[in-house]
């Protein structure tokens, strides 16, 4: 099985990176054909934009051979970034697993998203194979 996993770059200090690094330390990449793509780095806006573009280019390159796309998603900008990747994965008819991180997703969804954005996020989450 070929899995493409996306999330914050493994060098970022944060929860998503810690989980991903733990998966690598546990040998997940030895058990499945895993490609990890970091979609965000710490640093300037320019560095973040460059990382996002690089991630997008790599994603469309490896996506055709993938069986599953695993998105590590948190609130705010992380959610919007991952939904872009999810939409592309769905265009390629790929199965998508969403792993939601962080305790503030409900606050983001209910307090910081308009009704229109909530509807879009809900629609996308419902299109995933599984949402954990």
Q: For each predicted feature, which ranges?
A:
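A short, histidine- and acid-enriched strand-loop-helix "catalytic/donor-clamping" loop
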Residues: 74-78, 96-114
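Anion (oxyanion) recognition and catalysis
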Residues: 28, 90, 125
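A short, charged, and often flexible helix/loop element on the N-terminal side
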Residues: 35-64, 71-82
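Charged helix-capping and loop-helix junction motifs
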Residues: 82-87, 113-118
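An anion/phosphate-binding loop that grips the pyrophosphate of nucleotide cofactors and donors
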Residues: 66, 128
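Conserved small/polar residues in nucleotide/adenosyl-binding loops
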Residues: 130-132
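Active-site proximal beta-strand in glycosyltransferases
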Residues: 68-70, 86-105
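N-terminal subdomain of nucleotide-sugar transferases
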Residues: 1-41
